[in-house]
Amino acid sequence: MKHLTAMNELSLEDIHELIEEARELKKGKSDSVLSGKFAANLFFEPSTRTRFSFEVAEKKLGMNVLNLDGVSTSVQKGESLYDTVKTLESIGADVCVIRHSHDHYYDELIGHVGIPVINAGDGCGQHPTQSLLDLMTIHEEWGRFAGLTVSIHGDIKHSRVARSNAEVLTRLGAKVLFSGPDEWRDEDNPYGTYVSPDEAVAHSDVVMLLRIQHERHEKKAAERDYLETFGLSLKRAELLKKDAVIMHPAPVNRGVEIDSALVESGRSRIFKQMENGVYIRMAVLKRALLNGENKKRGDQAYVLFN
């Protein structure tokens, strides 16, 4: 049994193995090795891509799928997340995929539940499967990470994608640049260098845009003039290197962080990221449940990612 809660739990070997497995699955490798097992998807925040990507991945692997949201569970009656997951485990769930608004929600689960927990996003914390699909997309484009420059633009402070990606890209040998409004800088993130939007775009092999995380701000941020000041406008896109590509974890706010004309342009890999997400999540689910480590063992502690 192997949880996945944060990217720093994965070794470089783990990352390469997951990407390679996802690539084989994408080629059409038939795989229903998890047939008959139950996956519980528990989402306490809105989600389109991550939620349905996991569901498609689970069904491609032959799994039975239980979809829950915070409104339809007994959490609304005061039940703790821990008791909810223990309930799902007791009625037969083999793995639990969770998105939650609280950072590190999984701390109360790891070592106390007998099924794998896969983090589908925790507040401003981590989003490991998004990072993995981003890495897969970059590797498909370049065949490497070392020596690349990846710039991350926008709401760095509130973005779990920025936090997950900056750490792992640095570990893989890429250079990370940050760009965005001063008030959205993440001073606790040591993995990137802050530069101007123009400098970031001009020097990057991969330009990764982020949406404004309105739901994590105390008051709604102004979007007026954001595109021209900080986003990837058509004018700023003229600075892109010849082979540079555009990425975005989505949802995309067209005309805010990126000009609408660029979303489906020849440089964009945004929908390729979404496609790759299915296969990465298939690989993550297989890793969680196979290799003889999926036996439920009560409440004992587990060592992550042996």
Curated annotation (Swiss-Prot):
Heterododecamer (2C3:3R2) of six catalytic PyrB chains organized as two trimers (C3), and six regulatory PyrI chains organized as three dimers (R2). Catalyzes the condensation of carbamoyl phosphate and aspartate to form carbamoyl aspartate and inorganic phosphate, the committed step in the de novo pyrimidine nucleotide biosynthesis pathway. It catalyses: carbamoyl phosphate + L-aspartate = N-carbamoyl-L-aspartate + phosphate + H(+). This is Aspartate carbamoyltransferase catalytic subunit. Pathway: Pyrimidine metabolism; UMP biosynthesis via de novo pathway; (S)-dihydroorotate from bicarbonate: step 2/3. The gene is pyrB. Signal peptide: none annotated. L-aspartate binds at K77, R160, R211. Its EC number is 2.1.3.2. HAMAP family: Asp_carb_tr (MF_00001). GO terms for cellular component: cytosol. NCBIfam families: asp_carb_tr, PRK00856.1. It comes from the Bacteria. Keywords: Pyrimidine biosynthesis, Transferase. Carbamoyl phosphate binds at R49, T50, R99, H127, Q130, A250, P251. One of its GO terms (molecular function) is amino acid binding. It comes from Bacillus licheniformis (strain ATCC 14580 / DSM 13 / JCM 2505 / CCUG 7422 / NBRC 12200 / NCIMB 9375 / NCTC 10341 / NRRL NRS-1264 / Gibson 46). It is an enzyme of class 2 (transferase). Belongs to the aspartate/ornithine carbamoyltransferase superfamily. ATCase family. One of its GO terms (biological process) is 'de novo' UMP biosynthetic process. InterPro entries: Asp/Orn_carbamoyltranf_P-bd, Asp/Orn_carbamoylTrfase, Asp/Orn_carbamoylTrfase_sf, Asp_carbamoyltransf, Asp_carbamoyltransf_Asp/Orn-bd.
